[in-house]
């Protein structure tokens, strides 16, 4: 029954988006004049909300513009507006970040290498290495990865479904007894390895890391909290690399004003999404995201089979 409701809800979203897109902005994104402020605000909202909950921002930023009839805004724009989410993560977790940073610095000065703050900083650092390493491998050995089959619509749908099933298993077998203070360096490495899965569009960075956290017995809110902290270096690096690309090559089919608008929109909606998720996971499970991911993936596959959605 829950899956049926999620399926119907997702279908209604797709239908509504298509109608809104056709009525408000009928032209696809093909040149610098056609990515309007309205479109940038919507795409920033999509980025902000879906980056911070375990449903994959990359998938939604590819699928939703297509459903709206706008076309794919491109990988560079998608990565750059993620910087808006970074601002919100820093804003929301400012106390955690300052405590960890200054605590780690004090520990190094006093040679207290068993300090929880130093261990947390090392955990985040070591946990970031896997996704950077594999990301560089992809850049070297699959230079056209952004246009590969792994970024196709059908691949995104399948990844969404598979990740939902992994989250089901994590919910079933995870003990959920360990809080934030019980995190150690090994946890950072394990969750960092789980984060590598996010290189596959449709998996979701927060989805893979929260799932990894649940597998090793973390509380849901603890898994989400560490997921956001761990994501800061990786998302920032990806956003800055693509920002440099846009600055070097020009903003082309996006435009500077639209990009800045998208970033600002992402800041606002990311903060709202983070605040909601952290409160939600204090008392609730992740089944709402499981049902949504299943419905999202299946609906995309149905759309492809029926010809409503193009497998690009």
Curated annotation (Swiss-Prot):
It is a multi-pass membrane protein. It is found in: Cell inner membrane. One of its GO terms (biological process) is regulation of cell shape. Its EC number is 3.6.1.27. It is an enzyme of class 3 (hydrolase). InterPro entries: UppP. GO terms for molecular function: undecaprenyl-diphosphatase activity. The chain crosses the membrane at residues 74-94, 122-142, 154-174, 183-203, 226-246, 254-274, 288-308. Keywords: Antibiotic resistance, Cell inner membrane, Cell membrane, Cell shape, Cell wall biogenesis/degradation, Hydrolase, Membrane, Peptidoglycan synthesis, Transmembrane, Transmembrane helix. GO terms for cellular component: plasma membrane. Pfam families: BacA. It catalyses: di-trans,octa-cis-undecaprenyl diphosphate + H2O = di-trans,octa-cis-undecaprenyl phosphate + phosphate + H(+). The keyword Cell inner membrane applies. Catalyzes the dephosphorylation of undecaprenyl diphosphate (UPP). Confers resistance to bacitracin. NCBIfam families: PRK00281.2-5 (NF001394), undec_PP_bacA (TIGR00753). Bacitracin is thought to be involved in the inhibition of peptidoglycan synthesis by sequestering undecaprenyl diphosphate, thereby reducing the pool of lipid carrier available. PANTHER family: UNDECAPRENYL-DIPHOSPHATASE. Belongs to the UppP family. This is Undecaprenyl-diphosphatase.
């Amino acid at each position: 029954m829950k899956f049926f409701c999620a399926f119907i809800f997702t279908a209604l979203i797709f239908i509504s988006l298509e109608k809104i897109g056709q009525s408000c902005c009928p032209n696809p994104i093909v040149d610098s004049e056609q990515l309007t402020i309205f479109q940038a605000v919507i795409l920033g909202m999509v980025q902000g909300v879906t980056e911070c909950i375990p449903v994959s921002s990359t998938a939604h930023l590819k699928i939703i513009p297509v459903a709206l009839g706008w076309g794919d805004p491109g990988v560079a724009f998608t990565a750059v507006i993620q910087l808006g989410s970074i601002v919100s993560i820093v804003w929301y977790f400012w106390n955690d970040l300052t405590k960890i940073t200054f605590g780690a610095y004090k520990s190094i000065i006093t040679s207290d290498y068993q300090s929880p703050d130093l261990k947390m900083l090392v955990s985040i650092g070591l946990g970031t290495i896997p996704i950077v390493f594999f990301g560089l491998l992809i850049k070297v050995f699959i230079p056209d990865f952004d246009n590969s089959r792994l970024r196709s619509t059908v691949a995104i749908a399948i990844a969404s479904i598979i990740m939902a099933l992994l989250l089901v298993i994590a919910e079933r077998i995870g003990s959920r007894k360990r809080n934030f203070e019980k995190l150690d360096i090994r946890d950072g490495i394990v969750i960092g390895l789980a984060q590598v899965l996010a290189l596959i569009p449709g998996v979701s960075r927060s989805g893979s890391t929260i799932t990894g956290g649940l597998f090793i017995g973390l509380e849901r809110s603890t898994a989400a909290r560490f997921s956001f902290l761990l994501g800061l270096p990786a998302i920032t690096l990806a956003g800055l690399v693509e920002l440099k690309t846009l600055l070097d090559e020009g903003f082309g089919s996006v435009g500077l004003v639209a990009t800045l608008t998208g970033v600002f929109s992402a800041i606002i909606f990311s903060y709202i999404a983070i605040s909601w998720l952290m409160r939600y996971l204090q008392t609730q499970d992740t089944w709402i995201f499981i049902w949504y991911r299943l419905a999202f993936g299946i609906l995309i596959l149905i759309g492809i089979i029926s010809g409503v959605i193009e497998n690009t």
